[in-house]
Amino acid sequence: MKRAAFYFALFTVAFLGMLAWRLAPELTRPTHLDPAFQIPSPFELASLPLATRFDFPLGSEHGALAYNAQRFTENHHLGDDLNGIGGENSDLGDPIYAVADGRVLLARDGGTGWGNVIIVLHAIEKNGARRYVQSYYGHCDEILVDAGNDVRRGQQIATVGTANGQYFSHLHFEMREFVTPFIGPGYREKTDGWLNPSDFIAKHRGAPEEDVGRTGQMPAPQSSP
């Protein structure tokens, strides 16, 4: 009797397991990470263009014509909120520039509270050793680049937006010491892995204060034969 009960229970478990497999086959499939969130390979890191100079992403190269409405660590803020000097939505649609040469890791809608987001990975070389940092551009209106694109310092990559109407237009700008791209919280008490954006760019500008204007940074247009 006990043996019959055992075999019946075993048959029931096997039957229910098979039924679950047939009704929900997706549970048996391997999961795959979004390619945008995979760690770049050593080859991809080695092929990154070197960033020899950094400039500010909004206004002029050294940050004029824009102001910092909420600074790094203020209210646990993980970046700088950059606005046009007119305030409110006066900078809506203004150009956002890549702060340095690099490669776009992510360019897409970041979800609620973010609007469009772009993340660019930069390689810095000093004494033969490479260091990698990310520049992060949040609340963009229009995205002008795709993931995988190489960009140059001063290249327009987006326009200033409102996170789909959630805020007055501004650029949420971060600098990070990460390789893998992720959207992030925007606010966090611990800032490990995040850099003070204004301080970082000021230290890596490699140009005098009077060096303004972005002409000459973009590839020259190809003339028709």
Indicate where each model-derived feature is located.
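Active-site loop architecture of trypsin-fold serine endopeptidases
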Residues: V160-H172
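Hydrophobic alpha-helical membrane-insertion segments, chiefly the h-region
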Residues: V13-L23
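Short aromatic-glycine-enriched beta-strand elements
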Residues: T112-H122, S169-H172
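Surface-exposed, glycine-biased beta-strand/turn segments
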Residues: R22-N116, E125, R153, T162, ...
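Short peripheral tails and domain-boundary helices/loops at the edges of structured domains
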Residues: A129-S135, R176-R205
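N-terminal Sec-pathway targeting helices
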Residues: M1-V13
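Short histidine-centered loop motifs in beta-beta connectors
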Residues: S90, Y97, G128-G154
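Short edge-strand/loop segments of extracellular domains
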Residues: L121-K126, T180
